Amino acid sequence: MSSVEITQTDSNNNTEEYNNDNSNSNNDSSNQSTELPKLHEAIINGNFEDVKKMIDSGNVNLEEGDFGGLHPLHFAARMGNIAIGQYLLDKGVDINAENNYGSTPILEAVRRGEVEFVKFLISRGANLSIGDIDDNTPLHLAVMCEDGELIPILLDAGSPLDAKNKDDETPIQVTEDKDIIDYINEFKALKEKQQQQQQK
């Protein structure tokens, strides 16, 4: 299965991209501040030493959300910055923290096609069963994006194939791509065969 090309945004447009991604959040409350926390800004800029100094100062809240409820780890996931993600997790942040729309860091990484960060979060024990506000799990999103690189990774990591979103759809039901459907069916058949052999 070939990987799906995902458009990457250069670092100069990171803040603008953030604002566009969260534009819907502004509609929740006209009085809600849209000012980005300083730690979030530092993570967007991608300077690990600056982020480390801020965290080590003890003057920042590692679980603070922006106006959309995105925590620092969500931002590290969006930027694909493993060094920052590692440091945040080592400081005890919640790997499965949810924003205002139920999105966890691994869901953010999947949406952005941040393959290495997804693998990193899996290695640290991210929950693959948690869905967003629409109950879409990481595998649902990878299938929706037709991400041929992430789908095998998520399947191998044990993503639930029978998880249903709010439309009562399992991951295989959110695509019409025959190659993806065939791949998931073959994976499922192989897993079932392996389980049968283990039971003998």
From Swiss-Prot:
SUPFAM superfamilies: Ankyrin repeat. The keyword Repeat applies. Residues 9-34 have a biased composition (Low complexity). ANK repeats lie at residues 34-62, 68-97, 101-130, 134-163. PROSITE patterns: ANK_REP_REGION, ANK_REPEAT. Disulfide bonds: none annotated. Keywords: ANK repeat, Repeat. Pfam families: Ank, Ank_2. Residues 1-34 are annotated as: Disordered. It comes from the Eukaryota. The keyword Repeat applies. PANTHER family: ANKYRIN REPEAT DOMAIN-CONTAINING PROTEIN 39, ANKYRIN REPEAT DOMAIN-CONTAINING PROTEIN 39-RELATED. This is Ankyrin repeat-containing protein DDB_G0279043. The lineage of its organism: Eukaryota, Amoebozoa, Evosea, Eumycetozoa, Dictyostelia.
